[in-house]
Design a protein with these regions (language model features):
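Metabolite-binding pocket within alpha/beta catalytic cores that recognizes anionic/polar moieties
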Residues: 1-127
Length: 127
């Protein structure tokens, strides 16, 4: 849904961001991540959604907080796609169930245990 041409929740329009978006949950992490961008600018803040843009090696990038949980992340991603994004990197804490994974480890997941309802709207439960 658009309000004055802007996405309802993230408050941006098509063309405000490029293809690549980093997604932390916590809005406070956005500025910390944006400090690594060339020419960072905060372009929106509404509720749990904070958005910064900049570039890395000349490539436009953005960082957008998603808040907590699947529903708010889905809202952010769907609105970001409407504005031109197509590649996302989720960053932040998560839980684990094996002793071999320690705090501070970087994990690139190939699957997950999903015990919530939002992801079922996007992927089969077997994924």
């Amino acid at each position: 849904m658009l309000i004055d041409g802007r996405q309802m929740h993230i408050q941006i329009t098509k063309g405000d961001i490029g293809r690549y978006v980093i997604l932390p949950g916590d809005p406070a992490r956005c500025e910390k991540i944006a400090q690594y961008f060339d020419d960072p600018k905060q372009i929106a803040h509404n509720r749990e959604y904070t958005l910064w843009t900049g570039s890395l090696d000349g490539v436009p990038v953005a960082v957008c907080s998603t808040g907590i949980g699947g529903p708010s992340a889905a809202i952010a991603m769907e609105e970001l796609v409407e504005c031109g994004a197509d590649t996302f990197i989720r960053v932040g804490p998560s839980g684990g169930i094996v002793d071999e994974v320690c705090g501070g480890d970087i994990v690139i997941a190939t699957a997950a245990i999903r015990q919530e309802g939002t992801s079922r709207e996007y992927l089969p439960i077997e994924f």
